């Protein structure tokens, strides 16, 4: 009898703690900051992203996320390092990283149908969602199997696929283009450091992005299979890969998202027309290692 009472009290305490934790979480916890630029070569890109309200748009997209405390997203110069990372409740995106995205965007629409503007916005959305994915794992104590970097990649793809279908297709292809550019930019044979890195190789991330997208909607992303960008052997398993991701998201993260707010935000069309052209060469930086 006493043992059963103790069990009931323990269960009640755990339930109360979990309920209290959820009650403390709330949406609209994203804080943004454009850090002042001291490097003259970064001034053009810093001015451009601020004028485009890049962080304000990210703030809106992440507004439905229920967090226990504020999360800051900051853009700043990184002394020439092309990188992004999450640490101590702050997502940092280097202006050098954004400049590199612009530098590697194609001048014309590619044979795969990637417009220049999509090759800019796609990777930007990806890096925001990827680094915020790291923050989600930290803030919400999300249990992970495997590498955290892979899980952050998957969170980014998952959230991108929640845009309206036309926008999602453009963003996914734009993101994949950047990973393909990483592969093209590497010299072969690859160094051991590339294989030992916490990130997968650009080529692997390229196929992972396309696979999850194809698994989500084979009709919408059927072109990546028809054009040979996604091998048929991999495509056979993509639906199951997406189902696994969707199941994990439903169990672990969806309870921390304001569904009504998310529906309002993600049903809107976000992207400019494909005819819009990004500015060419806003700064001068060489190709770096992958972002964190």
Regions found by a protein language model. Give the residues of each.
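Catalytic zinc-binding patch centered on the HExxH motif and its immediate surroundings
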Residues: 75-107
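Bacterial N-terminal signal peptides that target proteins for export
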Residues: 1-9
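Short alpha-helix carrying the canonical HExxH Zn2+-binding catalytic motif
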Residues: 117-136
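An active-site-proximal "capping" alpha-helix that borders the catalytic cofactor pocket
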Residues: 145-164
